[in-house]
Amino acid sequence: MHIHVLGSAAGGGFPQWNCNCPNCDGLRKGTIKAKKRTQSSICVSADGINWVLFNTSPDILQQIQEFAPLQPGRAIRDTGVVGIVLIDAQIDHTTGLLMLREGQVKREIYCTDMVYQDLTTGNPLLNILDHYCGVNRHDIPIDGKHSFSVEHAPGLRFTAVALKSAAPPYSPHRHDPHPGDTIGVLIEDLNNGKKAFYAPGLGEIEPHLPALMEQADCIMVDGTFWTDTEMLDMGLMSKKARDIGHNPQSGPGGMMEVLDGYPGARRVLIHINNTNPILREDSAERVELTRRGIEVAYDGMDIIL
């Protein structure tokens, strides 16, 4: 299995266009040791030819241009993307669908009922695409027991589970959570049995998750915030990290503590907010992650399982 990180930042990217926090300001001025990052998305393949795209960020065109296998150039119109799996309906995970509207071939989109509802009502991107390329929508089972496959992506099997998290702010049921608003996915390579667990919007470790995470050779999870009060402390938001569906890395029950329970797996944080000190490669927080064997995803990162 080849996992390629197209984008590793949370919504807004890094640096964020309107932000002058120490990280964003420092990156622009070249006074901190850090890498620019686009908004989070990965693609996965078992054969290096047919790729499944997870989420479509607003930066998707740049991300495709920077990863050659997604444009193999076999015909006058071509793509290496054979299917798109949407983890949720968040703006930073779905806006890129509009950038993929060209062509006569329908987009093969895999999503839950709740995500489909949001993308045909509150933010009707799929309705818009029907006037361009069109969409073949495939349902994703979320009970953790029934797997699904993506046509034309041989050698891969996917098992999804519902995660406790918040629907997007635009969603008609923003304050009435439903199973399927956000999912985590166990990705299995049927050729060698290797597995990866991908959950960029993991707000809470629920009882049904350890059984899936224990199977994974690689765990890629929510790296949005370092502390629960990160945005509060900077005066940027009136809510805590957990209030908006993100489990911070530090503190009791935080993501570091969770990942410590899976020492045999490769552990990677993705979907990192521009305020998070782990973006600074020489920060004390980054040193602590390294000490624990936890990696920080970056654009262009390749994981081979």
Curated annotation (Swiss-Prot):
Pfam families registered for this protein in UniProt: Lactamase_B_2
Keywords: PQQ biosynthesis, Transport
Known role: May be involved in the transport of PQQ or its precursor to the periplasm.
InterPro entries, A to Z: Metallo-B-lactamas (IPR001279), PQQ_synth_PqqB (IPR011842), RibonucZ/Hydroxyglut_hydro (IPR036866)
Protein name: Coenzyme PQQ synthesis protein B
Top-rank taxon, per record: Bacteria
Pathway: Cofactor biosynthesis; pyrroloquinoline quinone biosynthesis
